[in-house]
């Protein structure tokens, strides 16, 4: 009897799966806006695919992946001279699986990006596809994923590696835009509360977080100089750390310059501290991809070198373990990759709940839309509840969309490529197993992204001085 009731309970969700997001999540968040709920669902789909990609890297999945016809051919080859390769499969199948899943996700979101180009309101028939028909969209996505596993090897992995590296670099810049937006909104919110009442409390809170971020950045710089450089080597690392430290100091000084404060009073050191810490992370992440292991210690050797002086006997020499290559299933995630995924999740969730009406960065990128009126939609939602109708998420896009559907899907497409590169540690498909690490192009992509990030942040500060005809208040 319980099973029958369960079937009918699941069947009740079928109409919602074929309709809009307002129905799909109406019982969970009945007072939410349709634009927010839709983005959260897409974000959940992307996060779920990330989990699936990670599971595919586990050793337990290797047996099942080997059974796929032709899947053990081409890309991420293991040479006999490097390791006793499995005679049935000499390929890092875990990495190949991640490439296939990310390919399916990227294609799915790229097609939707093209399909949703120039959608202005929810009255557009294409908006119904964007906000609804979840059953068919999920089924199509699963179909693309399954089909991608049967793509012939050949040059697929090598070509997709280049595409993934470019897409991941672009998404790093998008993360910076979101972080700048978040920092501006955070600072503006707390400054407003400080002006409204209890200024000492909010001033202390701003000062505490700003100081904490700068202290963490200084500690990071010290650790990078100590463990990622050598007196007689690692010249590139010394250059990367030094130039980014100088650029962060310059950006912080610009943020509190009187001319900047005059045209943009909301700018301050809180935003600069967030960007500085993110830049230091990008610097560490870039150096963690260097091929030279002597200038790129892994996390375990990093910790050992810190604790060795206290753990080793006085008359002995502490032995630092040599880094070990990833397992053949490709299941190892480096520490910087975990942090990268954590930052990715935060930015993805923020991009799903933010609105264009309170975005500082949208004004700089000409992508904001402040003309959307929410009063009518809120009133209609309340009247539905009074009439006894089922409460659903409010359609707040009848007069104009709250965000660009096309750009949102393009961001998710780039995010899929970023996940692919992160889960595979930016490894090149043609790298030998005994030196399984990223090549210099991946290092330069990340470090260049950190420079562009800083330049982009400085632009958000000086834009009011340059574009005097625009309103940045």
Swiss-Prot record:
Q: Does the keyword Membrane apply?
A: yes
* Glycosylated position list: 34
Which catalytic reaction applies to this protein? a 1,2-diacyl-sn-glycero-3-phospho-L-serine(in) = a 1,2-diacyl-sn-glycero-3-phospho-L-serine(out); a 1,2-diacyl-sn-glycero-3-phosphocholine(in) = a 1,2-diacyl-sn-glycero-3-phosphocholine(out); a 1,2-diacyl-sn-glycero-3-phosphoethanolamine(in) = a 1,2-diacyl-sn-glycero-3-phosphoethanolamine(out)
Does this entry carry the keyword Transmembrane helix?
yes
Q: Which GO terms describe its cellular component?
A: Golgi membrane; plasma membrane
- According to its UniProt entry, this protein's organism is Pongo abelii
Concerning its family, UniProt says:
Belongs to the TDE1 family.
- The residues exposed to the Cytoplasmic compartment are 118-132, 181-203, 261-329, 428-446
Keywords in alphabetical order, please: Antiviral defense, Cell membrane, Glycoprotein, Golgi apparatus, Immunity, Innate immunity, Membrane, Phosphoprotein, Transmembrane, Transmembrane helix
Modified positions (Phosphoserine) are 371
Identify the residue ranges that face the Extracellular compartment according to the record: 1-96, 154-159, 225-239, 351-406, 468-473
Designated name of the protein: Serine incorporator 3
